[in-house]
């Protein structure tokens, strides 16, 4: 290694990495510099030395990129949640398309050099797009603060005005923090593993309805807090408590109880309505979700005699978009409340050709196949960890004729394509910017079974 810790070096940034950092070479050593942009000449200090690379802190920009902008966020550098807010937005979209190429080059699935990778679809107004927040709460000198941990640390950043967060949910979390302090509710302490640890607030774009979850180590009396919140925010329709007394980093425990209001809120996508219970997954960016799901529907190109599996179905949002176009839809999800929502949503929409089960895709689909069910269309929307090996093996043994992979992690997507391209051709990859100003992107992949 040609660098040492705390060494200060000049560096020319050759490209950007998948996490939005600048990448350069110093005496043949690969250096990652968060905050630096392609084409810039910088002065930086080595902050970490690894076996094959080093990381550095940006100290000074000697030659600035013409694509650099000044982030409007006052805590941009301190927070670290929006890794590329300093990059002009149209260039962010180009970067996200390139991230897909980088992932493919790393894993090299069959034929990757010839994949059609379409330009990333962006937002006309890429601010205040996050309809859901999950803020940690901590007490400092008797003052309750809500926010996120600074990237790579356990230091809480008090966030009062996030530029990517829905304005109403931000206003509500600010008030929640005040009320938790006012009524002296116990706030989470990592030594005692007790108190309110996290607050989730989600707003439905279509109805404007809001739901709130207090995640706490034990049941507490939130009555006074709820009374004030309901009086001040008429949009609030559901308040729930989730019990998580574990010492793990998992946000949620197994028990969720609605303590005030209705069981779910109402949302819409692709011109149909559905219900969302507090624990059910739904995309963070409702506006771009319309585009993402439209692209998924277009890519799968179903026929009326198709039998479709909607893996990782959540509340059924993607699968129900197909229910009126196919013979049958089957879906599964690991969250029982989401499956109950999916069943109720299908019933509300008048569909009798749907079937939903709680369970893991890698367990449920092989069982369905062993029972004789066959699907000729498959859509998967897995978590960032990608597809489980057991599910991949099931797909290889009995591949549906057509498949769409909706990915939120380009690295695990490229990894899974190594396996999937043994039986499928990749027609194209369409990325959609669900998270402006961050290094993350979503992608819709159209796959067709090889003959």
Swiss-Prot record:
Gene3D superfamilies: 2.40.50.1070, Nucleic acid-binding proteins, Vaccinia Virus protein VP39. It comes from Streptococcus agalactiae serotype III (strain NEM316). GO terms for molecular function: 4 iron, 4 sulfur cluster binding; metal ion binding; rRNA (uridine-C5-)-methyltransferase activity. The lineage of its organism: Bacteria, Bacillati, Bacillota, Bacilli, Lactobacillales. Pfam families: TRAM (PF01938), tRNA_U5-meth_tr (PF05958). This is Uncharacterized RNA methyltransferase gbs0448. S-adenosyl-L-methionine binds at residues 283, 312, 333, 381. GO terms for biological process: rRNA base methylation. The keyword rRNA-binding does not apply.
